[in-house]
Amino acid sequence: MKFLLLILTLWVTSSGADPLKENDMLFAENYLENFYGLKVERIPMTKMKTNRNFIEEKVQEMQQFLGLNVTGQLDTSTLEMMHKPRCGVPDVYHFKTMPGRPVWRKHYITYRIKNYTPDMKREDVEYAIQKAFQVWSDVTPLKFRKITTGKADIMILFASGAHGDYGAFDGRGGVIAHAFGPGPGIGGDTHFDEDEIWSKSYKGTNLFLVAVHELGHALGLDHSNDPKAIMFPTYGYIDLNTFHLSADDIRGIQSLYGGPEQHQPMPKPDNPEPTACDHNLKFDAVTTVGNKIFFFKDSFFWWKIPKSSTTSVRLISSLWPTLPSGIEAAYEIGDRHQVFLFKGDKFWLISHLRLQPNYPKSIHSLGFPDFVKKIDAAVFNPSLRKTYFFVDNLYWRYDERREVMDAGYPKLITKHFPGIGPKIDAVFYFQRYYYFFQGPNQLEYDTFSSRVTKKLKSNSWFDC
């Protein structure tokens, strides 16, 4: 260590760069060793120039790869880049995929979350990981399935310090995660530094964004030198509402696995486009989706931004080609970016506007008795974390935290929702109010006072 520190000191002095503190030089040495393959031979002082040249080349290599001004000197911008949180996988391979192009020789891949960070709720960890896998399955033919016991292809672990592989974590900051390329044993395994503060938002370190990056490695991708790519080595928060893979990420992963399986051609609509201002207009289902409200009717849906004149009508198949027409119920869990759609005895999950794999599922998996064949309407209450399902003159209540139907249900709609009678066509929640749709009319229902506060036409949202 002292020998290499001496070389770094002499090199910085001879290069004309500003003098560096000893801890900066030690940090730079460690960084170049870990990520750029710096190795300095113990040679006589007379040949030390060779080592200085080698160090300068490694600094230049790092600067070029990370898009810095290539000077070969440990200047301020270079040290700042070195101090950014990053992935623990080296940058030395100048390929979009790992050396030898390791890939999974199958399209159905299992994963298991061995333990959970205490920084986040268990369901939020599972959702972030599932969503990260979905990013890659959307652009490849790969399918991912979570298992809870045994050995999975990709084992996911939260750990601190040394944890049984080649790379001990270094505490908060620095290396935040690493992963291994496809293969047996440790191949594909993905590790997150527990000393980081993991989150589902911009605070701390966003688990979803880091997981997308690390799972790229687990699928065979190496680091990219494109700053817009999720496979760029350093971490930076990206707005989750606008996040998408870069062209470089997609080219890399599709060079290994090809593109996604092709869907059937978009079917023609079964019904003509409905008229928004028809006074007899009835909706099949209504739900919020982010900052919009979606109104479903036959093969179409309108989306509307509240308190805005912006309204648009589209075919359901234009957004989700494999979904059927005639959606009968819908609800959103906004903080999870999840929308559930129902038709007959089946339901589908939409996440970030993407149809999720392994759906549709049976409504009976939610706990409905066998006599329930369809759902008329559904709505999620974000304050209670409960979803209400309406069927004829009855309703059920589902606990979204525990993922189980509450005991003591069904109950009569008229008894517990004063002023609301069966049968309900659609319902959604917006700013403390439920909006119940029955035929061409809707009722505004105050969840605080448990009473109907307004009677409106169903299409009043369209400024008709």
From Swiss-Prot:
Glycosylation-annotated residues: 69
Cellular compartment(s): Secreted, Extracellular space, Extracellular matrix
Residues the record marks as active site: 214
Signal peptide residues on this chain, from the entry's feature table: 1-17
Binding residues for Zn(2+) 1: 163, 165, 178, 191
Hemopexin repeat ranges per the UniProt record: 274-323, 324-370, 372-420, 421-464
Cofactor note text: Binds 4 Ca(2+) ions per subunit.
Record flagged with keyword Signal: yes
GO molecular function annotations of the record: metalloendopeptidase activity; zinc ion binding
Enzyme class, broadest EC rank: hydrolase
Keyword Electron transport listed: no
Binding site for Zn(2+) 2: 87, 213, 217, 223
Pfam families cross-referenced by the UniProt entry: Hemopexin (PF00045), Peptidase_M10 (PF00413), PG_binding_1 (PF01471)
The protein's required cofactors: Ca(2+); Zn(2+)
Keywords annotated in UniProt: Calcium, Disulfide bond, Extracellular matrix, Glycoprotein, Hydrolase, Metal-binding, Metalloprotease, Protease, Repeat, Secreted, Signal, Zinc, Zymogen
Binding site residues for Ca(2+) 3: 170-171, 173, 175, 193, 196
Propeptide stretches in the record: 18-100
Cysteine pairings via disulfide bonds: 277-464
Residues involved in Ca(2+) 2 binding: 153, 185, 187, 189
Residues holding Ca(2+) 1: 119, 194, 196
Binding site for Ca(2+) 4: 284, 328, 376, 425
EC number in record: 3.4.24.65
Stated family: Belongs to the peptidase M10A family.
Domain writeup: The conserved cysteine present in the cysteine-switch motif binds the catalytic zinc ion, thus inhibiting the enzyme. The dissociation of the cysteine from the zinc ion upon the activation-peptide release activates the enzyme.
Role: May be involved in tissue injury and remodeling. Has significant elastolytic activity. Can accept large and small amino acids at the P1' site, but has a preference for leucine. Aromatic or hydrophobic residues are preferred at the P1 site, with small hydrophobic residues (preferably alanine) occupying P3.
Name listed for the protein in its UniProt record: Macrophage metalloelastase
Organism: Oryctolagus cuniculus (Rabbit)
Gene name of this polypeptide: MMP12
